[in-house]
């Protein structure tokens, strides 16, 4: 009798404690995510901030803003506004919009170009570069991986290429889209 009473109390207390644990679903409902690209900040230095709106567990829509802080031509872009669409694979449950992703983007950028001017010298011509700022528009693709913890903090890395569509003789034809970003969902 005593064993049955202890067993009933034990099962009852375990059942009651299981009801008291409510899962934290706050991260599941968070639809906005703000990120800063740490790689661009260290390598540039350039400020690259992004906002992504989570559309579903498998897709997101957002934009990035890149500002070259050094004036030394970070990837030849002085300024870039880059809207993007991402499609996420694999880790669709849990937090959604995480895991491996493929991204398509377009970039509207102010690009620094160089136009050479030949100067005659006895040893041969010397070309002195003149800088110009031009507008460029590109389309591209990137791929990467994103992790999100239960607190809503995220880390991602991505790598991609964009091709400039406006032809000039003074700018590159392609540009990289590279990053290691830290962010927070809200």
Model-derived segments and spans:
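Membrane-embedded beta-strand positions of outer-membrane beta-barrel proteins
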Residues: 36-38, 63-65, 83, 100-106, ...
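Short loop/turn motifs that connect adjacent beta-strands in outer-membrane beta-barrel proteins
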Residues: 21-31, 57-58, 75, 90-99, ...
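Flexible, solvent-exposed loop segments that connect beta-strands
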Residues: 66-78, 108-135, 167-169, 178
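Cleavable N-terminal export/targeting peptides
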Residues: 1-28, 186
